[in-house]
Amino acid sequence: MRSSIHASRLRKMGQSIPASTGPMARSANRFLQNRAAIFGLVLLTPLLFAVLTYPLWLPYKPNDIDLMAMNSAPSWKHWFGTDGVGRDVFARTMEGGRISLLVAVSSVVLSTAIGFLIGAISALGGRWADAIAMRSVDLAMTLPPVIFLLVLASIIGSGIWSTVVVIALLSWPVLSRMIRARLLELREREFVMASRGMGAGLGHLLFRHGLPNSIDILVVYATLQVANAILLEAGLSFLGLGVPPPAASWSNMLNAARSTAVLEQFPWQWLFPGGALVLAVLAINFIGDGLRDAFDPRAELN
């Protein structure tokens, strides 16, 4: 009664009644107030636009060879200069961004799927499923990551999709533990217990209850893991186990320019792809930190 009287008084005074907002709207508002996250978006958006659209407006292809312009410095004709066989460094930097981001995003999608399924099955599948899943996670986390990465890469081989598989197999255990912790709390709630009592199967529990209640973890993990995957691909390609030439990626462009002569005499061959890699990783980390703060449940208490 008092609330209706108060609302009618507000209407008479011409004041609007504040509408309640949902958790997603509040998270979006917190993200938009994060200056570092917005700065990351400002950095990443033009880079993504250039990487995705460069074939439409750039006259050079990544593997076009011009023997008359080998090791040319940056100019109006070749904005980032050329490499040792006359290939346009700007075109290769844009193509390298495509391949590096393709490897990173694909590996993150695969590792996110593996991590969610194992963590959710561990939490919702019963005692034996929990024991088996967690022992596999413990085994994966005890392996030295660098040695594990090199052994997997040498077994599977080099190539774009081989690199995707290698990075994904290294990245899923942390996510599975996070998902398990979230869903162990969820499975004791009334609506999940009611679903179990009505005979709901594991698939229903995973995708009807587990997935919607893990979206915040998945979004934050995937965003931050993209930056980590770019760096892992860079390490593999720098060691000759990632994306093989002549395909361009930021990391194998750096690998091709690591000789002393190139480092000292032709710095544009490593400066531009290295700068693009650093900017992309920095921007994605800023965005990931912003998403993590936006989805932080402790922010609801402030």
Swiss-Prot record:
Membrane spanning stretches: 38-58, 101-121, 147-167, 230-250, 268-288
An annotated GO cellular component: plasma membrane
GO biological process: peptide transport; protein transport; transmembrane transport
Keywords: Cell inner membrane, Cell membrane, Membrane, Peptide transport, Protein transport, Transmembrane, Transmembrane helix, Transport
Keyword Nuclease (UniProt): no
Subcellular location: Cell inner membrane
PROSITE patterns: ABC_TM1
Membrane-protein topology: Multi-pass membrane protein
Ligase keyword on record: no
Subunit relationships: The complex is composed of two ATP-binding proteins (BAB2_0817 and BAB2_0818), two transmembrane proteins (BAB2_0815) and a solute-binding protein (BAB2_0812).
Family: Belongs to the binding-protein-dependent transport system permease family.
Protein name per Swiss-Prot or TrEMBL: Putative peptide permease protein BAB2_0815
Organism: Brucella abortus (strain 2308)
